[in-house]
Amino acid sequence: MFKGSCVALITPFTEDGVNYEELRKLLEWHIKNHTDAILVCGTTGEGSTMTLEEKKEVIKFSVEVVNKRVPVIAGTGTNNTKASIELSKYAEEVGADMVLIITPYYNKTSQKGLYAHFSAINDAINIPIMLYNVPSRTGMNITPLMLDKLADLNNVVAIKEASGDLSQVAKMAELCGDRIAIYSGNDDQIVPILSLGGAGVVSVLANILPEETHNICEKYFLGEVIESRNLQLKYLSLANSLFIETNPIPVKTAMNLMNFNCGPLRLPLCEMEDSNLIILEENLKANGLIK
């Protein structure tokens, strides 16, 4: 387990595949800038448009480069339970520290099926599981009562909570906050979720502000709550600009503007609208990230 900021890392692409040279640079940059954990092949990493072999290679490569300096979390969840088990087993074999398992999307399921999905994955592996709740993308919600039940599974240790509903997060903390670590899945709610006993954030913002996102959490944990809150508010407009279009379109665009060689987005993701690009550039300039 970790406390603090986990970057939901973008995946740098070339026209033909993954840019491993740039990926290595990004991994080292995050460790140097105090990122507390690294998630690969998640939503921000465009995992849904990577091939199975690409995901396996990125997980293996990242584990080897990071070499236990910080935890590496592998995004292995899909809407196919069998496929999720296969990739989770692979992540365990190559030394990932945790897997991130999203709720089934598109085909979705019932609450009974949701429990069966996570339970089957839990029983097939021996590695910590972080659940991922993002109803806006999946059409499914892990309710507080369901989380209370899932928290009893032996490998389920955490949840990335991106419902945006602080009342729901509070109920989760009340029911099972002593058995499961709750991480904010939204950069605009880091401090509010920390105030409910949260353990940190799985962050898009950390792709461009790794140390600052770490500091929001670190200062809170040190009891410097006002300083933590001030940082949350300082970067609020920038964080919001990263969601002006579908994530990870803005953050990958931002990183390329910042002279990281992150390459293209994969269809169906595409270049930003000019009007939104102007807003993103203004926020990057305001924070000294581009000239």
From Swiss-Prot:
The record marks 43, 106 as: Part of a proton relay during catalysis. One of its GO terms (molecular function) is 4-hydroxy-tetrahydrodipicolinate synthase activity. Disulfide bonds: none annotated. Belongs to the DapA family. Signal peptide: none annotated. Pfam families: DHDPS. GO terms for cellular component: cytosol. One of its GO terms (biological process) is lysine biosynthetic process via diaminopimelate. The keyword Cytoplasm applies. The keyword Lyase applies. InterPro entries: Aldolase_TIM, DapA, DapA-like, Schiff_base-form_aldolases_AS, Schiff_base-form_aldolases_CS. Its EC number is 4.3.3.7. Its main location: cytoplasm. It is found in: Cytoplasm. This is 4-hydroxy-tetrahydrodipicolinate synthase. It is an enzyme of class 4 (lyase). Catalyzes the condensation of (S)-aspartate-beta-semialdehyde [(S)-ASA] and pyruvate to 4-hydroxy-tetrahydrodipicolinate (HTPA). PANTHER family: 4-HYDROXY-2-OXOGLUTARATE ALDOLASE, MITOCHONDRIAL, DIHYDRODIPICOLINATE SYNTHASE. Homotetramer; dimer of dimers. It catalyses: L-aspartate 4-semialdehyde + pyruvate = (2S,4S)-4-hydroxy-2,3,4,5-tetrahydrodipicolinate + H2O + H(+). Pyruvate binds at residues 44, 202. Pathway: Amino-acid biosynthesis; L-lysine biosynthesis via DAP pathway; (S)-tetrahydrodipicolinate from L-aspartate: step 3/4. It comes from the Bacteria. The gene is dapA. Keywords: Amino-acid biosynthesis, Cytoplasm, Diaminopimelate biosynthesis, Lyase, Lysine biosynthesis, Schiff base. The active site is at 132 (proton donor/acceptor), 160 (schiff-base intermediate with substrate).
